[in-house]
A protein has these predicted regions:
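Flexible "cap/lid" loop of the alpha/beta hydrolase fold
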Residues: 1-34
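Catalytic active-site module of serine/aspartate enzymes centered on a nucleophile-bearing elbow/loop
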Residues: 122-165
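Membrane-interacting alpha-helical segments
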Residues: 9, 104-107, 164
């Protein structure tokens, strides 16, 4: 890997204590909801916590959300059952941050222009402050890759070219 672009990485360490507790509860609730009610209900709760209203997303001309493929649904299952629970129990410590710092020249931190300071946005800016890195803005919000695919790809090329990639 030459460069990693981390778009709104979810690292609870960079939330204030009250937000961390709320985020941990939302993770637990989304996980339990998934087991009882399935994907749609769980992701609705998760999205709402992160300021995403799927019924009110803005799209670039011609863009729309596509139905999820079987592979994407399997990825969502893994995300909800394995990754989400780890958010509230596994956090970077100083030694983990040191590992990231050692490779920070290969890291681009990014947020969406429409993220409106949601918790992922705050996590990203907290990580950037700890690492001494800038935050690049990309079109759209947390799901900007899907709502603004052309503009997002254009911005990604700009960011990578500016880094000589």
């Amino acid at each position: 890997m030459d460069t990693l672009v981390a778009h709104e990485p979810s690292e609870f360490l960079f939330l204030i204590e009250e937000e961390r507790a709320e985020a941990g509860q939302v993770v637990l609730t989304a996980y339990e909801t998934y087991k009882k009610e399935g994907f749609g209900a769980a992701m609705s709760r998760w999205a709402a916590f992160n300021g995403i209203d799927y019924g009110n997303l803005e799209f670039e001309p011609g863009a729309q959300l596509s139905p999820m493929t079987d592979e994407q649904l399997a990825n969502i299952d893994f995300f909800i059952t394995h990754e989400m629970p780890a958010y509230s129990t596994v956090q970077l410590d100083e030694s983990g941050l040191d590992v990231v710092r050692a490779e920070k020249g290969r890291l681009v931190l990014a947020t969406g222009t429409a993220s409106e300071r949601n918790w992922s946005y705050r996590c990203t800016h907290g990580l950037a402050a700890r690492l001494g890195l800038p935050v690049e803005e990309f079109p759209g919000g947390h799901v900007g890759l899907k709502t603004h695919p052309t503009a997002f790809a254009t911005r990604l090329r700009e960011v990578l070219r500016a880094r000589g990639r």
